[in-house]
């Protein structure tokens, strides 16, 4: 794929991620870039979980990176925004509104990605409000099953902590939430991304890029991750902490 095509693809992906919340499948990618290639195997199904007060960069970075990975592998990658409450419009931390057309269906996902947001404003929409409400942490706890990887970034990790998912597990989060994560039983690691098999966590805000690039490398291979880094003009930061064995 040449540079002009890559830049055009990036623009299309950015628009899709921030305005429609729709899955960018292989057919859409081919239309956007003027290219097509045979696909094989089962698709990698990614659900990015949204809620009112979610941070804009947290929701956009993993979506765009994982959607763009479709161009660097012969495996389809299907990325969708979902909400626990079904089809609705969410309002992000800085006022961006997104219409989300997909409801909660973790049984149809291989990877759940949980962003953060609103952690500094305890009475505003965001992570604290979702913890008080209780429904999303319960749903995340119940979603766990063999074959599903749950990933979270920034203070989205605290939703997993409230669900009991991080208890006794290596993990990380935004630096302002690290003490509480440890108090609630998380085993803190000093790394930007922590991979403990079916649980992958990342630090604050921009760490969403590194989380997504790591997941691409893990699920789709090094070449896909390198291709994305070149397209995005961004190199993954830091050493990923990984457990000795992955479930």
Could you say what each language-model-derived stretch is?
Residues 158, 175, 196:
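Positions that flank functional sites
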Residues 129, 170, 202-205:
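Short capping loops/turns at secondary-structure boundaries
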């Amino acid at each position: 794929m040449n540079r002009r095509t890559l830049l055009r693809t990036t623009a299309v992906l950015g628009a899709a991620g921030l305005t429609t919340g729709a899955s960018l499948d292989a057919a859409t990618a081919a239309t956007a870039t003027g290219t097509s290639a045979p696909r094989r195997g089962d698709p990698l199904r990614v659900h990015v979980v949204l809620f009112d007060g979610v941070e804009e960069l947290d929701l956009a970075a993993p979506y765009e990176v994982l959607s763009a990975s479709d161009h660097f592998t012969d495996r389809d990658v299907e990325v969708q925004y979902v909400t626990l409450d079904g089809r609705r419009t969410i309002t992000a931390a800085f006022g961006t509104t997104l219409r989300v057309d997909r409801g909660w269906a973790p049984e149809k996902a291989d990877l759940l990605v949980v962003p953060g947001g609103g952690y500094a404003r305890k009475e505003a929409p965001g992570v604290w409000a979702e913890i008080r409400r209780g429904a999303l942490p319960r749903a995340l706890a119940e979603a766990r099953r063999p074959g599903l990887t749950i990933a979270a970034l920034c203070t989205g990790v605290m939703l997993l902590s409230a669900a009991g998912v991080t208890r006794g597990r290596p993990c990380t989060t935004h630096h302002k939430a690290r003490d509480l994560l440890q108090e609630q039983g998380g085993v803190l690691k000093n790394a930007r991304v922590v991979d403990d098999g079916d649980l992958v966590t990342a630090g604050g805000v921009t760490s969403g890029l590194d989380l997504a690039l790591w997941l691409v490398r893990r699920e789709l291979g090094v070449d896909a991750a390198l291709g994305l880094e070149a397209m995005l003009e961004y190199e993954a930061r830091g050493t990923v902490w990984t457990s000795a064995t992955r479930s």
